[in-house]
Amino acid sequence: MRRSKAEQKQETIQTLIQTARTQFSELGYAATPLEKLVSDAGMTRGALYHHFGNKEGLFLAVLQSVQQEIAVRIESEASGSDDLWEQLILGCRAFMAAAVADNNRRILLIDGPSVLGWDVWRRTDEQHAMMTLRDQLQIMQTQGILKHASVDALTHLLSGAMNEAVLWIAESSERQQALEESVAAITLLCEGFRAD
């Protein structure tokens, strides 16, 4: 059965994103030659330009894909508990572990902000992991689990703390230990928001 044009288009987009993700995570954005990328994807430069405009547009699509996968992982791992407090901590752990994974670290932490600029990188974060965090905190506050405070302020505070923690974890020679220490520290921080 022949694929529709829409299916062919989606397949082309996904092939370019997956090929670029592999190369960007291994080589970095700057060191990834466009010719090799499109060749490895079995595409032409024209296909890349048609769907993404340029290499930076493709990188943005890769970053959004990484952010979406991390948000799904957060929700999946947090749903392992019915307890809202435990869900928050599980979600924080999932974010930090996913952010420092070998296939995400360079794209998310290094090239994301430098290639796209802080504002664009921040917006993609707000549309994915931060949104998941904000939703969880809002539910917890509505149910009286958190002290009364601005959910937006709490979201930015926790997100900033975790973003800084993942930079530290990524540079650590003992990543697993650094992850555990960061989860313990985030848990202590969150305890300060817990209603009595």
Language-model segments: residues:
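Amphipathic alpha-helical packing segments from all-alpha helical-bundle domains
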Residues: Q68-A71, W118-Q143, D152-H156, E180
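Alpha-helical DNA-contacting segments of helix-turn-helix folds
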Residues: L60-V66
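Amphipathic alpha-helical segments used for helix-helix packing
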Residues: V100-W118, E171
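Short hydrophobic/aromatic patch on the recognition helix
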Residues: A41-F52
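Hydrophobic alpha-helical connector segments
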Residues: A61, E75-A101, L154-L158
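C-terminal peripheral helix-coil segments that are non-catalytic and often amphipathic
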Residues: M1-R3, L90-A101, M130-Q143, S159-A161, ...
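Short coil/turn segments at alpha/beta junctions that flank glycine-rich nucleotide-binding fingerprints
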Residues: E26-A30, S81, D102, Q143-G144
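Basic, helix-initiating cap at the start of DNA-binding domains
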Residues: M1-L27, A31-M43, G57-L60
